[in-house]
Amino acid sequence: MSKENFETFIDFGSSKIRIAVFDNYYSKIKFFSEKECLSTFNLENINLTNSKKIIEELIQISEKKIGIHINSVNLMIDTPDLFSIDLSIKKNLEGKKINNNDIKYLLQEAKQLVQNNNFDKKIIHTIIEKFVLDDKIFYTIPEGNPECNYLTLEIKFICFSNIIFNQLSEHLKENHISIENLLCSSYIKSLNYNQLFEKYDKKVFIDIGYRKSSLSIFDKNRLILFNIIPLGGNHITKDISQVLGISEEDSESIKKSLNQTESIFSDDSKKEFISNSKIKNKLKQNISLDLLKKVIHARIDEILNLSLKNINFSSLINDKNKCILVFTGEGSKILDKNSIYLENKFNFFREMNFFEESVSTICQSGYNFNKKNYLYEVNIVSKKLKKNGFFEKLFHFFN
């Protein structure tokens, strides 16, 4: 098979790097793998030192499995400084019928406004939330080219640091790899997982990563809110380390033990899930598990409260029975297995779900995103369309 028959996705996380190669002919995954690797994407301290060898190993393993050289990838990534911008832009049509060129014009104007005021950022996703024709709201392009005085588009842009992007590009070039597309990992994952909960009208996804957490809220298939905060599972590890007076490595071991236990999180169950005798002795000497629970719960509370800050759920959620809260990400595992109870805090949801992710489900989200023409998404990043103008890059949105 030729290179064009395969598509490669790398999910570049702060604690793990995942790779998956998809066979376009059969539309299925051909090979996937992952390796642990600590990287820092903070603008003040970008550290990709450990990842070069890991990426090289993952690429080489993948190439051996598929028998073809890989020279470009779709890069899935989240960073603590990634953010979204909501913008509303209007055009006076003077009672004329709307057409695609009017919409394209407004999209171009909006993109230019965002770019001019955020010159150090790269727009990686553009989502049209609403089409407003005078006082009528539409969530898809109105059929029949109706007449109106004013056409308004409400648009969400997800932006990424140019500095980090350029460093990632140079970093991958050292392995002779170019970036085909840059994708916000937490956004496209929630977009894909959203389809698994179709019986619910309102779906709230909280993805707790290593150094960041993200929030995505959907009204059926429509994204209505996206946000990222610079707090994640590693902050829980550091809290445990400070309170217990042990290394972060030992703290991470305790946290992983809690992730795996089915027992109730209390002093009585201490022997059941802490197998490391060194850590167990330190716990006996320094702190009770009940206090440890409070430390962890305090940080989890902070992550959740900051994620859900300024959201009026009483107006957002009008029917509890049709709402679900879904936790994803490595950092959310500590909430599962009866370790910590959150039901009382989120009693306006009918159900809470701890979605078990894997390399295949994560990278499949990227593949599905590239293959499906999501109704609200405008693709302005594709490298394959680099020579075309902005309007041409919207062809799939209007066809």
Residue ranges and their predicted role:
Residues 1-16, 20, 24-72, 77-203, ...:
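Nucleotide/phosphate-binding catalytic cleft detector across ATP-hydrolyzing
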Residues 195, 202, 206, 215, ...:
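Conserved mixed alpha/beta catalytic, RNA-binding, or beta-rich assembly cores of soluble enzyme
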Residues 15-16, 210-214:
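Short acidic, Gly/Ser-rich segments with clustered Asp/Glu that frequently serve as metal-coordination loops
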